[in-house]
Amino acid sequence: MTDKYRIDSHKLLYHVSRVNAWLGGENIYPVYMEISPSGACNHRCTFCGLDFMEYQNRHLDGNVLMERLSEMGALGLKSVMYAGEGEPLLHKRMVEIINHTKKSGIDSAMTTNATLLNEARANAILGAMEWIKVSINAGTSGTYSAIHRTKAADFNTVIGNMSNAVRIRQDNGYKCTLGMQMLLLPENKDEAATLAKLARDIGMDYLVIKPYSQHLLSRTDRYREVKYSDQLCLADTLREFNTGEFSVIFRLRTMKKWDQGERNYARCLALPFWSYMDAGGGIWGCSAYLGNEKFYYGNIYEHSFKEIWEGEKRQKSLKWVHEELDPLQCRVNCRMDEINRYLWELKRPPAHVNFI
């Protein structure tokens, strides 16, 4: 199926100069960062990987965050995805933060449940964003309510909000890509086609169908044993919904990797290229290890990003990861899995690479 955004792969190959600097031993700044503006969430999804963070009612200080965004943009950060431990739109200054991100020269995106993406917010942010991806894990309100553990009416609210977002984008000539995402579970597998049709009909650009991934620290493990080998044929059914303007991105490669549980790399090499900021201002090397001091770099309330990124804590963390961390003990299909596969191959090329 069409995946022009390379969602089932990676895009680091487009950042040749940054990769080359890393290969040359430079202390590069990240290309991408995930930021959690809010620790609170208005849903309690059955599959939530960050439930161990306990949906704390904490929010990043807007002034400090925007100061750091200006700094990070100047240092070379290319993109930010607002998502994290909670629902980003619960942050009262999210509109202002998104617009400041763009002014800082950083591409911004958001993963959201979209219940709070009303017309006013959509009007205020669509012109400043590269993409918005909605987590909507069912094709009917009943199943949606059961999985998101919220009121069934939220389903129609989300559909209405995204329909309005499409209209606002068209009326204003905005370029923001609008998509949806379903995490394929036993409870919703029979509604993937229903959601695909609905997403296409309201004007979404794509629907991602992705596999579950067990977070190492998550309190929920009800889907730990789920396999996708008997669901792969669903790709053929969903392909029928593709048009010139809409595509279903069925993450076949990632599903197979989940079932196999294997990696082709013996070390995590991706950490210099990305970072995670939690809702308390903490900077981490990996979102799969939130709370593990070995991955903690510092806090934006205490230090500038430059001080954190070039600081002793981060250097010790990178050294430990390089020498001791075994990726086989990490989360399967982690955020940086495809990046690691790519970098491992660059570091250990096969024979005959000069015969291009």
Which residues does each predicted region cover?
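Hydrophobic packing within well-folded, soluble alpha/beta domains
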Residues: 41, 45-48, 97, 101, ...
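Residue-level recognition of short loop/turn positions
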Residues: 44, 85, 112, 279-280
